[in-house]
């Protein structure tokens, strides 16, 4: 039964009292402009309200934006308590919703469900695709649903822990293995961490070499269009990507966006990680990246120590305007590693899908003054000069808990549906967080609502 939101300020509402998400799945949230429904996926934890019953649930919060009510729908009960398992969403032309999700490398199944027409609260049975013939039972992680040229892709981390894809030519009713997007000899935990952005005629992506705790990553960009994998300058990398019978290229053959060790101002950036990518209708591409700032330990052997504290991360805004190369500008400090055993986790910075000049970032440093705050706060930033300078407004302030991992849900260009979760997170499997929504008209101010 739908329940009315719990208001947390003048503008902010709690729409789910137990949930969190990772950031390597998309779209994690979508708006249907016709029905004014917003859907966002999350995982419930044992530490949260009703945790004994809900722990590990793959949940969708279905929000009626017109009536300010929300309903939590369970896609899979007691699935796995891990924020890496959140579903990717896609809305079909027939009004049905598709949700796809995996475990965090603990089995080899992609799971998906399809809703009733125009009703994301009513779902058909769960179906599965077994990757094990390709992964040799080493597990699969993440789902990303993007359409290109009439074909639906589901990008996952799978074979050799490389970015791979399944394809569907029937709107997600069935799936077939396409192949690897790119590959290279494995270092440490996994290979490239990839973020995707789909447009009308191409899918753009940014990726890393490996996990930042295992490798001093650079960041690379490419795009899929016309059946070809391209570099940023449109030169071809591979004429037949996903050729299951052949081998995929290495991501180093793409265009380098940020070099490991590159300096922005007086700070050397290392161990970079992908956060978000969006492409504007005019062809401008923007990406947000996190990196360690001046983090070369005195003993080089300590650089890849898993539990060594990393005290300084930076947010980077990278951009390619039409006909030009990539530029890189600092967004500000991202703070120390969010978790002791995950030194490269941050609150994240993301891009408005309808305005690449607008970003939202979660940080314990106020970008207006540089002052450190007791908790991670959300800030909205706008640029008028391609990222060289920014004007900031606080979305949250004086918080008693951290505000983390913002999302601007696409689907309705007339509104800014800003989501984040707030609370305490000690691991991807342990958190007590609630999901917050701020829904405003695009022309409205995004200032603090508390």
Predicted segments, located by residue:
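Extracellular, repeat-based ectodomains that mediate carbohydrate processing or recognition
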Residues: 2-450
């Amino acid at each position: 039964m739908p329940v009315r939101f719990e208001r947390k300020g003048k503008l902010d509402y709690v729409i789910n009292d137990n949930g969190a998400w990772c950031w390597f799945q998309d779209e994690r949230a979508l708006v249907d402009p016709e029905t004014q429904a917003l859907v966002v996926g999350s995982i419930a934890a044992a530490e949260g309200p009703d945790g004994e019953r809900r722990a590990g649930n793959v949940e969708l919060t279905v929000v009626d934006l017109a009536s300010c009510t929300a309903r939590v729908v369970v896609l899979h009960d007691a699935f796995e308590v891990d924020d890496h398992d959140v579903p990717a969403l896609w809305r079909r032309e027939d009004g049905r919703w598709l949700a796809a999700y995996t475990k965090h490398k603990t089995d080899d199944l992609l799971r998906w469900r399809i809703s009733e027409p125009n009703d994301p609260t009513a779902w058909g049975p769960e179906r599965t695709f077994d990757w094990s013939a390709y992964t040799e039972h080493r597990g699969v992680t993440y789902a990303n649903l993007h359409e290109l040229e009439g074909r639906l892709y589901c990008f996952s981390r799978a074979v050799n822990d490389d970015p791979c894809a399944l394809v569907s030519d029937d709107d997600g009713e069935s799936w077939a293995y396409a192949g690897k997007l790119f590959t290279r000899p494995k270092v440490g935990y996994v290979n490239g961490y990839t973020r995707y952005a789909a447009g009308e005629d191409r899918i753009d992506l940014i990726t890393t070499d490996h996990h930042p705790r295992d490798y001093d990553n650079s960041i690379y960009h490419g795009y899929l269009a016309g059946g070809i994998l391209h570099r940023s300058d449109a030169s071809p990398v591979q004429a037949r990507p996903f050729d299951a019978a052949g081998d995929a290229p290495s991501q180093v053959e793409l265009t380098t966006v940020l070099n490991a060790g590159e300096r922005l101002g007086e700070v050397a950036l290392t161990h970079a990680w992908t956060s978000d990518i969006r492409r504007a209708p005019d062809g401008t591409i923007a990406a947000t990246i996190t990196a360690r700032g001046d983090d070369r330990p005195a003993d080089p052997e300590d650089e890849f120590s898993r539990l060594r504290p990393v005290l300084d991360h930076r947010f980077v805004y990278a951009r390619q305007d039409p006909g030009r190369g990539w530029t890189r500008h600092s967004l500000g400090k991202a703070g120390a590693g969010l978790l002791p055993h995950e030194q490269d986790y941050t609150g994240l910075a993301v891009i408005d899908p309808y305005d690449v000049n607008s970003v939202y970032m979660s940080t314990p440093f106020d970008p207006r003054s540089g002052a450190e705050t007791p908790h991670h706060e959300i800030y909205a930033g706008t640029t008028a000069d391609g990222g060289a300078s920014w004007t900031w407004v606080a979305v949250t302030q004086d918080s008693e808990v951290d505000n983390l991992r913002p999302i601007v849900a696409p689907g309705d260009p007339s509104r800014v549906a800003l989501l984040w979760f707030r609370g305490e997170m000690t691991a991807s499997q342990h958190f007590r967080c609630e999901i917050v929504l701020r829904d405003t008209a695009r022309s409205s101010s995004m200032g603090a609502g508390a």
